[in-house]
Structures are given as C-alpha cells and as structure tokens.
Amino acid sequence: MNLRLLLLLSLLQWSFSCFSVQAITTPVVYYGKVLSGGKGIANVPVTDGTQIVLTDDKGRYSISSTSNAEYIYITLPDGYNIPMKGKVPAFFQKVPAQPSKKVHIDFELTPSSTDNKKHVLVVWADPQVYFDEEMPQVQQASKDVKELLATNYQGIPAYGIVCGDIIGDINTKPSYFAPMIDAIAETEIPFFYVIGNHDLDLNVRSNEHARITYKSYYGPTYYSFNRGDIHYVVLDDIFFIAKSYLYVGYLTEQQLQWLEQDLKQVTPGSTVVVAMHIPTYSREARRKAVSYTHLRAHETRRHL
C-alpha cells in the first residue's frame, strides 16, 4: 500500500469517526407541556430515558438530550386517568428518527373522577402464548378478571400489569402481540407491560436491537407511574447476549441512573412497587457451582 493511499484511508477513517461522534453528542432540545383541560400540571417528571426533569408551575418542561433518545415520556401522576392508545397506556411519545435541534412534544391528561388511594392491582406473568388455540384461554382469563372485579371490588379503581413473557416465541409468532393486547383489554382495565426474555427479538446482532418488535407495540421498557400513594416502577432486566436464546439478568447503568433520579421524586416512606421479569432474589446465588444460570442478576440486584 503506497503512502498516498494510506493517507487517504486515514483521512476517511478520521472523518467518519468525527461524523459518528457528532451524531451521538449533538444535543436535541425536547420541550413542551403536560396539560389537563388546557392548563399546565406542575411537578410532573418528564424523561428521555436517561435524565428526568420536572414541569414548572405552568406545566412546561425542557430536556437537552444527547442520549439518542427513542421516547419522551412522563411518570403518570395520581389524580388523572391513564391515557390509552391502541389499548396500551400512552404515557410516551416516540421521537422522530432524525430530530431537528428542537422538538415540541405535549402531553394531555384528563382528571380522574375516582380516588385511587384504595385501588386493585391485577398481576399476570408468563402467559407465553405459543399457539392459536391458547388465545381463547387468555380471553377467558380476562373475562374471569372482569367478573371478579365487578363482584368483589365494585367501585374500586383497578389496574393490571403483565410481568413479561407475553408471548411464547417471537421468532415464529411476533404477530401474537396484537391479539394478546386485544385479549387482555377484555378485562376493561388499563394494563401495563413488562418485557420478558420470550418477548425479545433473537435473530439480531446485539442487545440494543432485541426490543424493536416489543417497543413497536408497548413503547419504553422501563418507566414509572403513580396510583394513590403507591409509586410503581417497571424495569427491564433482560440482557440478550446475541447467541441463540441466551440471556442474563442485568440492569444497565443508564437504567440504574434513571432509577436513582426517579426515586428522588418519591416522598420518603412511600410504598414503592417494582416490577421486572427476572426476580431480584434467587437461590441460585447460594450455589457454589459456577454455571450459565449463575450469571443472572445477582450483582445489580444489590443496588436496588
């Protein structure tokens, strides 16, 4: 390779490196309001998934984001209904793929007519639907929940959460996400969702690409919301290691830093409920033998 060609390749490499760094670090300002009936709501946490800011007394917020944010979203405050879109809680808005330097995003909430201080939380986990013939069972379970709430908890607001593994095999049946949303909506209560290992895209090159399908239906994989005096936090503790179906339990540093900021907004002494797919405690940690399963969330759990 002659010196002239080597110099040209070096310059090209340098220019591409500079472009890549600029694409990551150039700030984008996301701004707007959190409103109810045209009036701003104060002290609502707004996040890009990395940093959290609070709305001012007029409901205004501004985030200078350098994190390649996918969403701008809020911590749903108590006293307002859960906004729904496509039968999924709509506390988030997806940002443009190539945002301008300033992006305007507003959120509109409606006041709740019920007191959430006493409420019901329905928890499901691992429905793992693989086949068409299993869907009627989910529909029946939803009807059972609806009947139970009407019989035993009439007049008490109710919410639900699915703690991961919504479908069985995303590689063969990613289309099951949509009918699962429809089936669960038959409970007629708002349901939140947690990502599980069965909900990951597996034929991808890295963990960063493993949530594309899931996010297209449910949005952010970690977030929080308030109902009554309880602060609910949903975390994503699945890390795909880009080999077959293998994964480990792991909370990213970005997510932990977000969680620290989130919890700073919670009144000390409040009840905090954390939902994630892989448990924070496992007897595997007591085993002396080192194995694949021993890799799961035994370190990051200590920081919760």
Positions of the model-derived regions?
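Short, acidic Ser/Thr/Gly-rich low-complexity loop/linker segments typical of extracellular
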Residues: 50-65
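Beta-strand-rich domain onsets/edges
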Residues: 18-29
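A short, solvent-exposed beta-strand micro-motif common in secreted/extracellular proteins
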Residues: 68-85
